[in-house]
Amino acid sequence: MKQTVYIASPESQQIHVWNLNHEGALTLTQVVDVPGQVQPMVVSPDKRYLYVGVRPEFRVLAYRIAPDDGALTFAAESALPGSPTHISTDHQGQFVFVGSYNAGNVSVTRLEDGLPVGVVDVVEGLDGCHSANISPDNRTLWVPALKQDRICLFMVSDDGHLVAQDPAEVTTVEGAGPRHMVFHPNEQYAYCVNELNSSVDVWELKDPHGNIECVQTLDMMPENFSDTRWAADIHITPDGRHLYACDRTASLITVFSVSEDGSVLSKEGFQPTETQPRGFNVDHSGKYLIAAGQKSHHISVYEIVGEQGLLHEKGRYAVGQGPMWVVVNAH
């Protein structure tokens, strides 16, 4: 398995393309100059395209991915109704979902043969919309509205329209600020990192019809932490055994172990990392974690070790200015 790591740096308007080898070392293979401040990125389900959101002209760009080395070639673009904060796709590669924090909306862009062709739906009134996350069964779009302490739930129709489910939302504790999410591989649990109180909620998906319950909330910060809480990102290993979340004020990655059924998180430790880690990701082997420092302009690679999933630094690399997004593609 070959793996390519993409790093988005909006301040220098670049995507750095790296080869990740089996020992966790990175080799720079390409630097792409992007026509705008590039932030969120996602790889298409068929691994043929990288979709990126840019501003100040709000667009989604599609780059064709070379199957041999992961190199990028521009392919298409489509306008967006707000500054892109988070980007994702459905599992069949029919739609791109874009959450916009500043516009307070989530939009759906239709794909034709992998290329974006236009917005088919927009839902407004999502104050602080920070991500759009399709459920493992491809039925429900989870959309955290950070400033409203709620996660809105939409059914995605065959033509890409969003229809509120029943119930239409779940709520967090007041002041939590739900931000980013991941799902357990068993498809029965979701995990949401809350920005404003730096906690992680565990949501049980009791049935496919929207019956959802928060079964655990865990503080992700050290006991003696007294500064402003400012959590950012969350990721889980492919085997579902280890979960990670980061805080930008503390420049810290919190390590969690996950119970076998996915229902319980246990805090295992903390890893100091790059300054102001806005984004990170786990590779497809589940052996390595790559974190980007928005203020350090570097990335660090960590090996995931032991039963606890603790992090051991393998290498550090300079990238563009203000790196914010990390995506790993296996090919």
UniProtKB/Swiss-Prot annotation:
The modification N6-acetyllysine is found at residue 287. It is an enzyme of class 3 (hydrolase). GO terms for molecular function: 6-phosphogluconolactonase activity. One of its GO terms (biological process) is glucose metabolic process. Transmembrane segments: none annotated. Pathway: Carbohydrate degradation; pentose phosphate pathway; D-ribulose 5-phosphate from D-glucose 6-phosphate (oxidative stage): step 2/3. It catalyses: 6-phospho-D-glucono-1,5-lactone + H2O = 6-phospho-D-gluconate + H(+). The keyword Acetylation applies. This is 6-phosphogluconolactonase. The gene is pgl.
